UniProtKB/Swiss-Prot annotation:
Keywords: Arginine metabolism, Hydrolase. PANTHER family: N-SUCCINYLARGININE DIHYDROLASE. It is an enzyme of class 3 (hydrolase). One of its GO terms (biological process) is arginine catabolic process to succinate. It catalyses: N(2)-succinyl-L-arginine + 2 H2O + 2 H(+) = N(2)-succinyl-L-ornithine + 2 NH4(+) + CO2. GO terms for molecular function: N-succinylarginine dihydrolase activity. It comes from the Bacteria. Pathway: Amino-acid degradation; L-arginine degradation via AST pathway; L-glutamate and succinate from L-arginine: step 2/5. The gene is astB. Signal peptide: none annotated. This is N-succinylarginine dihydrolase.
């Protein structure tokens, strides 16, 4: 049975703004207080989805969340009507209001970790929504994420959508941004690669000194257990703490994998040679031949990688076996990074094509092409069981573009977050969207 990788991109929400909430994410904190353009952000994301769909890749959409999250504000002691809750939070705790209004769920690489049926003990596709415990504004996402995923992957004979891990620092989980999978074919058993920043209980592992390590070893191990993965099909690796301190807050900022290929920086992992050898051995046992493409720091420094988001790219398998790499415009703006990419495409290796997308609205918050998508490997029967309304088509693209035009502002400044009308606009937009995507009632305001 044929199998495919489907990329489910996050649809940017109506409250997309620059509040600088993500300590350790250099782009996020560098653009704090700038005015954003939610309409442009959503359209940039949609254009990437449509372009890849037009190239023949399987593409889906993951809905944004209700923001501001009034329920979270109420839990923090802000009372009254919805408008009064927002007004009081704006006056007494504007940073908390900004966190409750964040559109960060657009980066669906953090939505969940996904294991395909070929890897799991029960033969189902498994999803574990990430608790995103390290940042308050992201930690409130997972209940809605789970409801949305269950509306998309509703057939419980084929799909298992777990609850998030305990929302506690020892099990800090950032989802697929620290996970990739190697395989000879998407429908064959593969090797799942879990990257962590620190261990919560084992003091032998080093930790970064400046920025937090958001993913723990214990969280990665728990997800592997939940998904029923075998030891023969799992590799754990620790990200180099120095790269975390250089702004590599998720592993998808310093490496990207697909199929039998890992594209990574020289300083991506601790004990890098041993890590690569373990992947190669385990993949060979599952019928694959591993290729590691290592970018030397002499050609691209960690700092250049962070600024350009070279590794926060998408590797996509083309017919014939070669791969396309999707990078943000910032890579073309860096002379050394662009020079490296041109050399890479001409090298005769597995990556032979580079595609550039303008994702500036997302990039200014620290999210490139890889951040915006959740990869789900599905066989034909599983793909047929997915809610068809969330799969990209010419009609869905036109419908979503019109939806954005009707509901999104083209400018959102920090002071606008105090406007109670923003909540009304967001709820109206999402109520219509659940109809377009066939999700049913998934948002708190719909469930009240």
């Amino acid at each position: 049975m044929n199998a495919y990788e489907v990329n489910f991109d996050g649809l940017v929400g109506p409250t997309h703004n620059y509040s600088g909430l993500s300590f350790g994410n250099v782009a996020s904190t560098s653009n704090v207080s700038a005015a954003s353009n939610p309409k442009l952000a959503a359209k940039q994301g949609l254009q990437k989805m449509k372009a890849l769909y037009d190239l023949g890749f399987k593409q889906g959409v993951l809905a944004p969340q209700e923001r501001p999250d009034v329920a979270s504000l109420r839990r923090l002691g802000f009372g009254g009507s919805d408008a009064e809750v927002i007004a009081r939070a704006a006056k007494e705790a504007p940073t908390i209001l900004a966190a409750a209004t964040s559109a960060s769920c657009m980066w669906t690489a953090n939505a969940a970790t996904v294991s395909p049926s070929a890897d799991t003990a029960d033969g189902r596709v498994h999803f574990t929504p990430a608790n995103l415990n390290n940042k308050f504004h992201r930690s409130i996402e997972h209940p809605t994420t789970r409801r949305v995923l269950r509306a998309m992957f509703a057939d419980e004979t084929r799909f298992a959508v777990h609850e998030a891990l305990p929302a506690q620092m020892h099990f800090g989980d950032e989802g697929a941004a620290n996970h990739t999978r190697f395989c000879a074919d998407y429908g064959q058993p593969g090797v799942e690669f879990f990257v962590f920043g620190a261990a919560a209980f084992d003091m032998r592992y080093p930790k970064p000194a400046k920025f937090p390590a958001r993913q723990t070893l214990e969280a990665s191990q728990a997800v592997a257990r939940l998904h029923g993965l075998s030891e023969a099909g799992v590799v754990y690796a620790q990200q180099d703490p120095d790269t975390i301190d250089a702004g590599v807050f998720h592993n998808d900022v310093i490496s990207v994998g697909n199929g039998e290929v890992l594209f990574h920086h020289q300083q991506a992992f601790l004990n890098q040679a041993d890590v690569l050898d373990e992947i190669a051995r385990k993949l060979e046992a599952r019928g694959g031949r591993f290729t590691a493409i290592e970018v030397p720091r002499a050609e691209v420094t960690v700092e250049e990688a962070v600024k350009s988001y070279l590794f926060n790219s998408q590797l996509l398998s083309k017919p014939g076996g070669k791969m396309l790499i999707v990078v943000p415009e910032e890579c073309r703006n860096s002379e050394r990074v662009w020079s490296y990419l041109q050399k890479l495409a001409a090298s005769g290796g597995p990556i032979d094509e580079v595609r550039v997308f303008d994702l500036k609205q997302s990039m200014q918050n620290g999210g490139g092409p890889a951040c915006l998508r959740l990869r789900v490997a599905l066989n034909q029967a599983e793909l047929a069981a997915v809610n068809p309304k969330v799969l990209m088509s010419d009609a869905l693209f036109a419908s979503l573009n019109g939806w954005v035009d009707r509901h999104y502002r083209d400018r959102l400044a920090p002071e606008d977050l105090a406007d109670p009308q923003l909540l009304i606009e967001c709820r109206g937009a999402l109520d219509e969207l659940t109809g377009i995507l066939g999700l049913g009632s998934v948002y708190p305001f719909q469930l009240a």
